[in-house]
């Protein structure tokens, strides 16, 4: 298992609330919690930025982290990430924040300590560009959105 440096920014982490951890042996994501001062109600259509109480330093340029929504919040309550996906670069060391967007027509209350998103580590390949005049032909070619069909 890869070791990632984690800084606790809120003393409730590790005391009232656990460190992010994998729920099962097969889990890909670690749950991030809302570490606000008090419960926060998100109005329909509103976007709020919520602290998680931690920062991480990945340090390895072959890794990044993504902050992804929790499926139940989106499906059952209309709560999704305001930026859809949060990308954490390997050299970022600041606090992890979660942008929550209430896309429903009902207010939603985030309680202190609620699991609001998940953190997933992903491999990164940094690429350079080779300028060409033409590409070798493929079956798909320039076919764009919907070109490959539905089934």
From Swiss-Prot:
<comment type="pathway">
    <text>Pyrimidine metabolism; dUMP biosynthesis; dUMP from dCTP (dUTP route): step 2/2.</text>
</comment>
<feature type="binding site">
    <location>
        <begin position="87"/>
        <end position="89"/>
    </location>
    <ligand>
        <name>substrate</name>
    </ligand>
</feature>
<comment type="similarity">
    <text>Belongs to the dUTPase family.</text>
</comment>
<dbReference type="InterPro" id="IPR029054">
    <property type="entry name" value="dUTPase-like"/>
</dbReference>
<feature type="binding site">
    <location>
        <position position="83"/>
    </location>
    <ligand>
        <name>substrate</name>
    </ligand>
</feature>
<dbReference type="GO" id="GO:0046081">
    <property type="term" value="P:dUTP catabolic process"/>
</dbReference>
<keyword id="KW-0479">Metal-binding</keyword>
<keyword id="KW-0378">Hydrolase</keyword>
<feature type="binding site">
    <location>
        <position position="97"/>
    </location>
    <ligand>
        <name>substrate</name>
    </ligand>
</feature>
<protein>
    <recommendedName>
        <fullName>Deoxyuridine 5'-triphosphate nucleotidohydrolase</fullName>
        <ecNumber>3.6.1.23</ecNumber>
    </recommendedName>
</protein>
<dbReference type="GO" id="GO:0006226">
    <property type="term" value="P:dUMP biosynthetic process"/>
</dbReference>
<keyword id="KW-0460">Magnesium</keyword>
<dbReference type="InterPro" id="IPR008181">
    <property type="entry name" value="dUTPase"/>
</dbReference>
<dbReference type="GO" id="GO:0004170">
    <property type="term" value="F:dUTP diphosphatase activity"/>
</dbReference>
<dbReference type="GO" id="GO:0000287">
    <property type="term" value="F:magnesium ion binding"/>
</dbReference>
<comment type="function">
    <text>This enzyme is involved in nucleotide metabolism: it produces dUMP, the immediate precursor of thymidine nucleotides and it decreases the intracellular concentration of dUTP so that uracil cannot be incorporated into DNA.</text>
</comment>
<dbReference type="InterPro" id="IPR033704">
    <property type="entry name" value="dUTPase_trimeric"/>
</dbReference>
<feature type="binding site">
    <location>
        <begin position="70"/>
        <end position="72"/>
    </location>
    <ligand>
        <name>substrate</name>
    </ligand>
</feature>
<dbReference type="InterPro" id="IPR036157">
    <property type="entry name" value="dUTPase-like_sf"/>
</dbReference>
<keyword id="KW-0546">Nucleotide metabolism</keyword>
<dbReference type="Pfam" id="PF00692">
    <property type="entry name" value="dUTPase"/>
</dbReference>
């Amino acid at each position: 298992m890869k070791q990632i440096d984690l800084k606790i920014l809120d003393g409730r982490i590790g005391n009232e609330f656990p460190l992010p951890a994998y729920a099962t042996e097969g889990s890909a994501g670690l749950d991030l919690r809302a570490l606000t001062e008090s419960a926060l109600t998100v109005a329909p259509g509103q976007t709020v930025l919520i602290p998680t109480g931690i920062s991480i330093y990945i340090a390895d340029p072959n890794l990044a982290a993504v902050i992804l929504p929790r499926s139940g919040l989106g499906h059952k309550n209309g709560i999704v990430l305001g930026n859809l996906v949060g990308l954490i670069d390997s050299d970022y060391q600041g606090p992890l924040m979660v942008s929550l967007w209430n896309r429903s027509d009902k207010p939603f209350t985030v309680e202190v300590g609620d699991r609001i998103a998940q953190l997933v580590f992903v491999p990164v390949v940094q690429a350079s560009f080779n300028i060409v005049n033409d590409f070798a032909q493929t079956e798909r070619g320039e076919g764009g959105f919907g070109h490959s069909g539905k089934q």
